[in-house]
Amino acid sequence: MPESLIAGIPVHFPFEPYPVQRAYMEKVIHCLRDGTNGVLESPTGTGKTLSLLCSSLAWIRTRQSEHQMQMVKMEKADFSGIGGGAPGGDLSELAKTMGRANNWGVPKVIYASRTHSQLTQAMRELKRTAYANMRSVVLGSRDQLCIHPEVMRELGNSNKTNMCKLRVHSKTCSFQMRVESRKDHPDLRGPTIMDIEDLVKVGQRLKICPYFASRELARANKIELGNTIVILDEAHNIEKICEEYASVQIKSSDVAMTIEDITHIRQVFASGESQDMAGDEPKDFTLDDLTLLKEMLLELEKAIDAVVVDNAVDGTTFPASMMYELLGKANFTYGNVASIISLLDKLVQYLLVASQQMSIRKGGTFTLLSDLLTIVFANKEDVMSKVYASFKVHVLVEESKQGHGKQQGAKQQGGWLGKGTIAAATGSSKVAKIINFWCFNPGFGMEQLLNTQVRSVILTSGTLAPLKPLIAELAIPVAQHLENPHIVDQSQVYVKIIGTGPDRQQLISNYANRDNPKYVSSLGQTILNVARIVPDGLLVFFPSYPMLNKCVDAWQASGLWADISCKKPIFLEPRSKDQFTSTMEEFYQAIRDSKGAVFMAVCRGKVSEGLDFADRNGRAVIITGLPFPPLKDPKVILKRRYLEANRTRENQLLSGQEWYNLDATRAVNQAIGRVIRHRNDYGAILLCDSRFKDASQVQQLSKWIRGHLGDRPQCSPFGPIVRELRQFFKNAEANMKLPDERETDSPLETVCKTEVEPLAAIPKVKREPGSNATFKSANESAIKVEMANSIKTWTPADYASAAGRKLGGAAPNAMDFMSRLDSNVSSIDFNCCTDSKSGSSGLVKIHKRERSSPTAPESTSQVSKKRYKLVENIKVEPSSSQAKVAPEDRAAFLRELRSLVTQDQFRRFGKALLEYKNGTYESFQALMAILLDVLSAPKVRYMLVGMRKYLKNEHKEEFDRRVGNL
């Protein structure tokens, strides 16, 4: 495999890298080498994933070699004379040793992406590289990995998760019980790179649970964020992810149904039916627990009833403190929330069993309440000022809900107002409500990630531009940034702004014009004329579903729909998840016909966000308008207000209007990225809205698109565009090689029927120039995994605990960080480039974590899993009036230490420090024993405190505890 020297690192690449790939890999290596953060944009089709893997693994391999040489050198060093040699001689060696304490081993690389299918594609790319000898383990959710037939019969992610927890807790899952005895089986520990399907097959063959087997392997390799490189691929929506996963909603009907469920459980207990269902097995909760919880929920319901909504249509906004006041009235506090969440989880498991024997809900409302408490009380008390600035509570009137309640009326059942009564209830507080707890600061979550002392964070995607607003919102220091051009030549892409249709009617999809019949007709005629010219697949993206439906209805009535259908069959993006797969299969089948097909979809939909329309599947894309967020949407209004209130010259945040415009353009960039998927692809991009010529809109498009539009883009007349477009495809078909049949004839095997998030691009392995190897179609071997693209929710349990350190007035210590981030991630962990089966060998990890009730013992959730906490550096008051602080410089630290202790003590300290590098827990205990023996006296205890920064992350909590007990 060819080797290229990039930024001083030898990188093995499957072929000679293109200039854009070299530039990209240079930026990645600079980030890893310097321990800085990067924001890197490289258009889809430029080999971004392959470049990420090869550059990061090449740096890891080089770093590993350097580390091994250092270890050999230190092992040969003779420290028998520590304390008795030439002045300063031994100190320099010890200083070097302590200097490497901040980086005891080779940093790991966590490669994270949005969906399971994207991670599967990354694993396929890894198999193509010279770094494919890495052992691997795939970490997926239960949807992908569970093989228990009864659990898999459950509908919904939450039900599957809870049923799995129940069976593990009750020891009725034979697959999970075999994991411990077979976790070291060669099929699991071998060097072969496994994807999700491979792991499932191994689990079925060994009759063990793939889900828990993969987590055993993860625990064996101690995944921690300290000194780790985090690469977030497909990060174009990272701000929204940070905001949405820190937000939560609870409805009056949810509270009412929770009360009803508790009442039903109490009745079952009272009647003795629970004994019939569970036999003599003791319950995890008592009637007193149920009574207390019901009283608290009744108080919460009363508190929600008392909230006055001034505007029953748009709702009313309150400060974030209102949520804590509301829960406080029901006695939900920081002191008892953990025990309440634990009780809720036990009730969910109880209802799962009960629902199999009687008609009863499975505890979904308990899960909702648990999510609410987990997210709201994840914001620690000492950072409330930042919480109040970053969050808002917005209360809406809940329509047509039936359930528990006290109101009566002709159109009411169980207390909830029916449709038509909301307006009349505006002046009343006792109506069903929706309580939204919204986060508007994405930097709130990113700051927590940085405070874990990761070595680097790299955000990358095909559509990140413009970069400055993204960096400003995330509030992370960025040393490396890149906007790559596309890998294709100018002649392979045709980009034009179409301002008028064939009838010279202006094309502008703004609010004032979208209902204009002349505009709708002109847009249809434009699509008809383009469909006559474009070969194979034509994609048409609309700003919204209502606009799509409006155009379809008008064209069907006027006959335009039939005219377009005569040229190419038309497919509409279905809103139903179940219909999506069949629709896509039919579209790909139509592409195989000579006429091709038209696919009409919406920006931000499944098609625009994830699918791959390479080669014949997508020869042109039409953008019919700018998909601005709903202007009157309460969340949009509050986001704009937040930006205006917090914008300063220093933080360079966008104004509310700039953010509003950018949100639309980013959705356009993502839709455009469905075509031009590789080096030999070609296609046309037609922007059918005259507003695209505005400088403010052009500057927000991806850099490679701006290059085709020029400095001062103008709307082109329709006639010349038709002639140019016809000539473009004539030249392209003559000069570009035909796509391989494997790229167009493959079925859509990676599309899931129950998609939650937009589908990932259908992975295709291309034959690159300079390579004689022939690769099988990725689609032909695509993995069929149920819900492979769904994204599990998570709760940011430690946002504020990390971010709040600055609010306390003290900057966080450089080495004071958590060992784990409680958030949903998908990752590949690159630890080592050897195929050794020894404990020091590396591991590749792909995993996604899901939100689940945070209390079950086997759960990976926050309450049960969190083992570490952020702590401030221990402060010890010396006997003197002026507090002493250990020197920051290593050499100065050692000189002062040697001046304070005896020669024998200093020699023992030096030897213990060197042995500590072996990484065993026993060596830490030996070092602690010497430290406590030598430095526990009040006059020198400040030196003991100063040693904390040189300890490994996993030992700091015990160090704090033992020093705190002095």
Curated annotation (Swiss-Prot):
Compartments where located: Nucleus
Residues the entry annotates as binding ATP: 42-49
Feature: compositional bias, Polar residues: 853-863
Keywords, in A-Z order: 4Fe-4S, ATP-binding, DNA damage, DNA repair, DNA-binding, Helicase, Hydrolase, Iron, Iron-sulfur, Isomerase, Metal-binding, Nucleotide-binding, Nucleus, Phosphoprotein
Family matches, as Pfam families: ARCH_RTEL1, DEAD_2, Helicase_C_2
Locus of motif DEAH box: 233-236
S-S pairs: none
CDD domains on file: HN_RTEL1, SF2_C_XPD
Reactions listed under catalytic activity: ATP + H2O = ADP + phosphate + H(+)
Domain of life: Eukaryota
Protein name per its UniProtKB record: Regulator of telomere elongation helicase 1 homolog
